[in-house]
Amino acid sequence: MQHAFHSDIDALYDNPDLDDLLPDLKGRRRLNLIRQDLADLGVAGLVEHVEPVFTKDAALDLPTALGWLYVAEGSNLGAAFLLKEAVKLGFSETSGARHLAGAPEGRGLHWRTFMAALDTVALSHADEGRVVAGAEAAFRRTKTLVDTIFGEAVPA
């Protein structure tokens, strides 16, 4: 699920317009960490390729992309709880659970830095609505991935 979601948004981390707006955008990318984790688990070859939501060559609606990145960044806060459970299974921030690791400066500061930058982006009322719609689309995508991968409906 994480691989599919982060594949969906990976192209955003190379977008120069987003890079101008958000601090350390490339450093916030987690897809390669997920790939390393899958290799640690011996399941890298089992991952199916799915066409990502965002591609490098497609036109980008900046507010929509900001909504998707908001969800990705927010998920890193919850990853602290998942990391604790992963450690109980024998994984760590250096093997099997890299993508769950917090930022060197700490999860809270990492999130606040992102949010401070997001709050400074000049957006019209309509743009703000597209940010929210982008975040909602990212949450729906995550739920669809969970339902598909785990084969059962998860309450919304």
Task: Annotate each language-model stretch with its function.
Residues M1-A156:
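Metal- and O2-centered redox machinery and metal/ROS homeostasis
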